[in-house]
Amino acid sequence: MGQRRWNIKKRIMAGFVLVLVAVSAVVALLFRQTENKLRTEYRRLVQRSVESAAHRLDTFIREIYNISDNYAFNNQLDSYLEKEYTEEQVYQRRADVMRMYRNIFETSDILQKREKISGILTAKGVLFNFADVNCDGQEVADRLTALGVNDPDHLMRFYWYPLQDNFMVSDASGDPRRDKAVFGSRRVYSVWKSAYVCAHIFCVQEEDLYEVYRENVVETKGEIYVLDEHGNLLSSSNDECIARGRIDDIFRERILNRTEDDFTWKSGYGKFEVCVRESELSRWLTVAVIPQKNITGEVNALYLRIYVVLILCLLGCVVVLLRMYQGFLPR
């Protein structure tokens, strides 16, 4: 009799185990399909968001290019570009900076909403610093020259330089996004003089670049990085990366050596979905990096909760049925 009872119990338990396995398999399959669909839809969302961020950055850059084009043919600047100053004429030079800013730049931007030229470095080596009139020493001009703003190989092409400390202003705020900037330069050629007469300098605070695509960061649930064509950092939603001034070397190589613009990247920190879009205007790379757990984390957590509840319910049913079965057996 005891052996018979044990056999019946084993059958009941085996039956519930089979039911548990079957239900778990069905639930796992449904959740896997949901996870794959969610990942596919999320990739599309990220792609649209990255393309939107890249388009906004292109609009921002195109405005800078247009401003440079406008002042490249402005005859009002010609008289200043020919000037040379002695060390004793520093205040005269600063007065000229104020006159240029007030009479030329401010009048073309009444609403004060457009990006402005941060400085002009003439062919004679004179620096007109519109970002900070008091920060116009020779060391600033030397650093601009070291960047390559007057490099003959650049011709008239606009060049951008990696994120770095903003040396064209004298005061630091302590906020890396405000203290770091992306420099851009363009050599200006005069058709009347048949020579390069100056270089336009644009100094864009990282904070201003970040504001251009900030809304897209929220949509992606990850981080966005803006790199130049060589993989150097220009801007990012990652505060630590901005403070460091560069991205991880392994990540940089992975981006530059990519075979497709949308891929999964596995690192020591986990798996990430990566989306890259390259600008035809500036050759900048807009890169979104999203941890996979941010995409399917909620679905996986829901699956785990349902699975735990399912097991508890089945175990409860086993206990109840065994108790009921024992009640019907003769003592």
Protein language model features and the residues they cover:
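Cytoplasm-proximal transmembrane signaling helix
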Residues: 226, 285-331
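Solvent-exposed, extracytoplasmic
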Residues: 98-111, 199-241
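Extracellular/periplasmic ligand-binding regions of membrane signal-transduction receptors
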Residues: 62-99, 118-133
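Helix-start (N-cap) segments at beta->loop->alpha junctions
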Residues: 189-191, 202-213, 240-241, 281-284, ...
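Juxtamembrane extracytoplasmic/periplasmic/luminal helical "stalk" adjacent to the first N-terminal
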Residues: 8-86
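Extracytoplasmic/periplasmic ligand-binding sensor regions of membrane-associated signaling proteins
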Residues: 109-113, 122-203
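Extracytoplasmic/periplasmic sensor domains and loops in membrane signaling proteins
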Residues: 90-102, 132-173, 236-264
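A short beta-strand signature within small-molecule sensing/ligand-binding domains used
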Residues: 176-190, 268-277, 284-286
